[in-house]
Every structure is written in C-alpha cells, then in structure tokens.
Amino acid sequence: MKVDGIHRRTIWVDADGWSVGIIDQTALPFEFRTRRLTSLEEAAEAITTMAVRGAPLIGVTAAYGMALAMRADATDRAVEAAHDRLLATRPTAVNLRWGLARLREVLSVTPPADRVRRAYAEAAAIAEEDVEVCRAIGRHGMELIRGLHKRNPHRPVNLLTHCNAGWLATVDWGTATAPIYMAHDAGIPVHVWVDETRPRSQGAFLTAWELGHHGVPHTVVADNTGGHLMQHGLVDLAVVGTDRVTARGDVANKIGTYLKALAAHDTGVPFWVALPGSTIDWLLEDGVHGIPIETRGDEEVTEITGRTADGRIERVRIVADGSPVANYGFDVTPARLVTGFITERGLCAASQEGLAGLFPDQAERSARQRVANDA
C-alpha cells in the first residue's frame, strides 16, 4: 500500500540479498521507521515485541527467520532449534506454525549446503502468495460492500473494524482492509469506524494511519463505542481479521472482538471475518476451550505511549500504583455469532460445512488425521 504516495510492503529482502527489512510498527503512527533483521534472534525479537504483528506477517517473518538461521548454521539440529525458537514467540497465531512447518518440511529434504538458498526462496514464495491471497480476499469482499452501496447509493457504506487486519498485518493489502481499499479505489464511497483497540491501540495507531495514507475516510472511536453505533444504524458491516479459525468456524482475534460480535448479533449488523486459508486450524474444533490465549505484560495496560505538545514521544502510566493487571491478548468468537468468512476462494458460512466446501482437500486430510490421533 502507499506511504506518502510511495508503494510499500511490510517486509522485504534488502539490497545486500540476505538481510530482511521490516517496518518497525512499534514506532507508528508518530514515526515511520524501518529495521534490518540479520539473525534468528532478531527475527524472533521482532515478532515477540510486535515490531511485526498480524498473523500472516508473523508467518512470513518467521519463514525469513528460518532463512537467517540457516546462514549461521544449516545443520539438522539448527533447523529444529530455529523452528522451536520461532514457534514459541506468539502462541495464538496459526500462520506462525504453518509457515514454520512449511520451511521445516522443505529444509528436511534439502542438503545442508543448499539450505540457505532454498530457505530464502521458500520464504519469498510465502510472501508472494500472501499478497495474491489478500488481493483475492479483497475482490470477494468488495462485492459485499458493492451490494450494500447499491441498496443505499446516496451515502457512504459505513464499516466497523477492530484491531489492525490491514496492510500492516500482512505483506500487502491486508485481510479485513483489502475489500475496503478495493472498494475505495473503485469509487465506492466508504467510511470506516476504527476501534482504538486497547491496550496496544493497534486501531488508533496502525489502522487509522494506513487508511489515512491511502485516503480512505475514517473515524477513530473508543473501544466501547461500537454497540452504540450499531444500535443507531451507523454501521452497515463489521469486518475483522483473525489469528486462528477452527475447523468448525470459531474465531480467535484481538481481545474485544467477541463483544463486537455480540453487539452485531443483537442489532442485526452483518459480522464478517476475513482470512487466508492458512489461518484455519483444521485439527481444532472447539475454539473457546482449545485455542491458547496469549497473555502479555502488565505494562501494556498500565502505560500508554503518546506525543506531547512539543513533539516528544513519551510513555506514561495510567493505572494506580499497586493495582493488579490482567492482559489477555485475544478472545474467541463462537461461529454462531459470525455471519460468514471472506477467503481467497470466496465467501462461505461460518461453519464446518462452509469451510470444508471451500477447502475440501484440507478438510478431508485433517479429518483423517483427527481419526488417526484418536485411535
């Protein structure tokens, strides 16, 4: 997408042919800053500290982390150690596991002398596939927005999104935002309500920043505003991304998504989830009890970053000293509250049957594996 009118991706191989460039998302929206990753540990740290974040981008970064690891040591033991180190960085995002499994499988049949080249090639392939997948998600989702506009052509289509499932969460385009960008570029008038998404404020810091750079009309709202907007007919469509979807359609996404889905269900607002097929965990059915929910540090809740009147970036405490804090990174929205899924293969119901209809090979393969695991 565009930054100051220049097309950018979120991750790339630098001109030296081996170091990996990223946008440091911890500096946004106050500073656009890039970073250079040169080792396995730097890639792992970028994921853990959320310099890169969003399930698809985490998967791509981890793949490049494996490639960086192979530069230092391409032995079988090093492959397993790099895989395990990166897998431990963010437990909720299934794309991380998927990308690492793909690299490990490729490297397991590649001679050590060729593993560096092969790892970079596979990581680049995953990145390019992500761009095409997000573009396809955008095309399918745009038709939902087009349909809403045809029903009421005299005003913009009002959308609500939570967290950041945008360009910054993928290599390009985004998942939840891809339909919005394509609709905007096609001349369909849209307006986006952007949840601030505490405690890390990915909506206020990231989604609003990227929408603004692309020229998409938007309004940032406090997290608890969505229900009020829906009650008063100010939201035509809620669309979010996801870090993991189970085989039966339960959705893990940034904390607060479940509450938005409840409000949408109560007010009759369509609630769609945009995702690539790689985000589906075909071996898991019950998301509420089966998806591991990441807990993060207290300081994300007790402190907040902002810019002072004289331009300084400061972090200040907002919670009374001594107050205990709980910081759950994600929640799970049951499939019954989700209108449907927007995927690279089209739209489907939020159900086991709906997902299996779009991804029959994966569904059949995982069903066989579950039977084998239960035997």
Curated annotation (Swiss-Prot):
Isomerase found in the keyword field: yes
Enzyme class at the top of the EC tree: isomerase
Reaction(s) the record says it catalyses: 5-(methylsulfanyl)-alpha-D-ribose 1-phosphate = 5-(methylsulfanyl)-D-ribulose 1-phosphate
Positions bearing the site annotation: Transition state stabilizer: C163
InterPro entries xref list: IF-2B-related, IF-M1Pi, IF_2B-like_C, Initiation_fac_2B_a/b/d, M1Pi_N, NagB/RpiA_transferase-like
Active site (record annotation): D243 (proton donor)
Keyword Isomerase (UniProt): yes
Keyword vocabulary terms for this entry: Amino-acid biosynthesis, Isomerase, Methionine biosynthesis
GO molecular function, one term: S-methyl-5-thioribose-1-phosphate isomerase activity
Pathway in which this enzyme or protein is active: Amino-acid biosynthesis; L-methionine biosynthesis via salvage pathway; L-methionine from S-methyl-5-thio-alpha-D-ribose 1-phosphate: step 1/6
One example of a Gene Ontology biological process annotation: L-methionine salvage from methylthioadenosine
Binding of substrate, residues: R53, G54, A55, R90, Q202, N253, K254
HAMAP family: Salvage_MtnA (MF_01678)
Protein family (similarity comment): Belongs to the eIF-2B alpha/beta/delta subunits family. MtnA subfamily.
UniProt function note: Catalyzes the interconversion of methylthioribose-1-phosphate (MTR-1-P) into methylthioribulose-1-phosphate (MTRu-1-P).
Name of the protein: Methylthioribose-1-phosphate isomerase
